[in-house]
Amino acid sequence: MRKSLLIIGLTTIACLTPAHSESGMGWVSYPGGEGPGKGKHVVLLAGDEEYRSEEAMPMLAKILSQHHGFKCTVLFSADPDGTINPNLGTSLGQPEALASADAIVMSLRFRKWADEAMKYFDDAIQRGIPVIALRTSTHAFQLPPTSGFKHYNQFGKKVLGESWVTHWGKHKAEATRGVIESANRENPLLRGVTDVFGDSDVYEAYPPADAVILLRGQVLKGMNPADPAADHEKTRATDKQKQGVNDPMMPVAWTREVKNSSDKTNKILCTTMGAATDLASEGLRRLVVNGVFWGLGLEIPVKAEVTPVGEFVPSKYSFDAFKKGTQAADYEPAK
């Protein structure tokens, strides 16, 4: 993996036909087709202020749609005129798309959706559909006390397996190398997953005993894939004891199967990686795609196709650094 992946665009080998993509106020949809995902609808939720989920989710949606046959709909936070605005935490475009979701891929942070939008999300969860959750989704919601769904403020801890704790690696200074958990290296979710790297930092995280750890995050001394492992000490937030920052390494990807209040089971894949720049890593993209297959009970390919459809040049993560004036239609393939 080379740093140049973050600088140059990644393009597909073949030219794919985008004839039936659609978009509207705060949403874009890509058609399903032939492939293992035929007849399945994946809804991807983009809504965080820092890590450019509004760029990452359309890229993942196009991979799932064009390479694997899933119908995919991306829902954004947007201003009333449809301009994408990740800072508008109360907004979710076309939440009714969740009514037909077979799986959710989410990259959210402190959303404050109205009860009408939360009802669609809650209904989807209660149906027992799988959830693939990235980065700040551990703290996806910050609903007000008046919300009928305020219990979702605990969604990270109770469902995904962890909430926000703190940055474990130094933010914007120590990148992450994904290290496969040796005890679970034969897990089907790890098929084709190699050389995972992200230039976002490791989060402090302690998933519960029922979680199956897939990857741990090695904190690096710098921001490049070839940098050596960091060797300083860090104080844990939980018990205030010091440990080597990589001894042990924090989990950065795990699965759970969680029974909800409707007595249905949600299959969960959570990763604390997932900035748009992290998803320049082929291995991390493949883990997310494998998660969709696993969640839906589909056979996970030996090496799933995860080449971006068209150009993918992820913006560097930072608050208020989103591309101004962008509409959902801008994420439709060129016609």
PLM features: what roles do these ranges have?
Residues 28-30, 34, 43-45, 49-140:
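Helical hinge/lid and interdomain linker segments adjacent to catalytic or ligand-binding clefts
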Residues 49-50, 111, 138-140, 218-222, ...:
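Short, solvent-exposed loop/turn segments at secondary-structure junctions
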Residues 38-39, 134-233, 304-335:
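An acidic, glycine-rich "communication" segment
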Residues 7-17:
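Bacterial N-terminal signal peptides
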Residues 22-37, 55-56, 66-67, 223, ...:
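Extracellular ligand-binding/catalytic regions of CAZymes and related secreted enzymes
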Residues 54-55, 115-117, 142-144, 201, ...:
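Short glycine-/acidic-enriched loop or helix-start segments at secondary-structure transitions
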Residues 1-4:
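Positively charged n-region of N-terminal signal peptides that target proteins for export
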Residues 47-50, 169, 173-178, 190, ...:
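Active-site rim elements
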